[in-house]
Each structure stands twice: as structure tokens, then as C-alpha cells.
């Protein structure tokens, strides 16, 4: 009788709780899709700090950390 109670507890309580954790991934995916809709200038402002590069004049394009922006 105790074994049946443990099995029921696992399937009726613990299993549904474990599957609810998987639903938390959806807002992150939606946020990533929204980021793709940004215009190129906004994307550049987000990506350049992430890549640890910066915008500079065309005279400084030889620097490895420089991302040359013509715009």
C-alpha cells in the first residue's frame, strides 16, 4: 500500500512539477525573435559591446578591435 502511495505521489505531484519547468523557455525564445526585428543600427549597438569591438573612423580600420562603420 505504501509503495502505491509513493508511485501515485511521484506521478501526480512530482512529474507535473517537473514538466512545468520546461515552459519557462518560451519567453526567452520570444525575446530572441523580437531582437531580430531591430533595425541594423540598434543591432550594431547591441552586438558590438558583446563582441568587445567599437565603431571608429575609416582611418582606424587597421586596429583589430575596431569595427568600421560607414553610415
Swiss-Prot record:
A GO cellular component annotation here is: extracellular region
Q: Does the keyword Disulfide bond apply?
A: yes
**Post-translational modification comment from the UniProt entry:** Contains 3 disulfide bonds. The truncated conotoxin tx3h exists in two forms, one is amidated, whereas the other is non-amidated. The conotoxin tx3h also exists in two forms, one is amidated and the other is brominated but not amidated.
Annotated tissue distribution: Expressed by the venom duct. Is present in all duct parts with a highest content in part 2 (proximal of the venom bulb) and then decreases in concentration toward the end of the duct.
Where are the 6'-bromotryptophan modifications?
60
InterPro entries, from UniProt?
Conotoxin (IPR004214)
Task: Indicate yes or no for the key word Disulfide bond.
Answer: yes
Give me the residues of the propeptide, which is removed upon maturation: 25-52
Q: Which residues carry this modification: Tyrosine amide?
A: 70
**Signal sequence interval, chain numbering:** 1-24
> Where does this one sit in the cell?
Secreted
Q: Cite the entry's keywords alphabetically.
A: Amidation, Bromination, Cleavage on pair of basic residues, Disulfide bond, Secreted, Signal, Toxin
Major subcellular location class: secreted
Provide the disulphide bond pattern. Answer: 55-68, 56-66, 61-69
Source organism's superkingdom? Eukaryota
Molecular functions (GO terms): ion channel inhibitor activity; toxin activity
Q: Give the stretches traversing the membrane.
A: none
Give the protein family: Belongs to the conotoxin M superfamily.
**Free-text note on domains in this protein's UniProt record:** The cysteine framework is III (CC-C-C-CC). Classified in the M-1 branch, since 1 residue stands between the fourth and the fifth cysteine residues.
Name of the protein in its database record: Conotoxin tx3h
Amino acid at each position: 500500500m505504501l509503495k502505491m502511495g509513493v508511485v501515485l505521489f511521484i506521478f501526480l505531484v512530482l512529474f507535473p512539477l517537473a514538466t512545468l519547468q520546461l515552459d519557462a523557455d518560451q519567453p526567452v525564445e520570444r525575446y530572441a525573435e523580437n531582437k531580430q526585428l531591430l533595425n541594423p543600427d540598434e543591432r550594431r549597438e547591441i552586438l558590438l559591446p558583446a563582441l568587445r569591438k567599437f565603431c571608429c573612423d575609416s582611418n582606424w580600420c587597421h586596429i583589430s578591435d575596431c569595427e568600421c562603420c560607414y553610415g
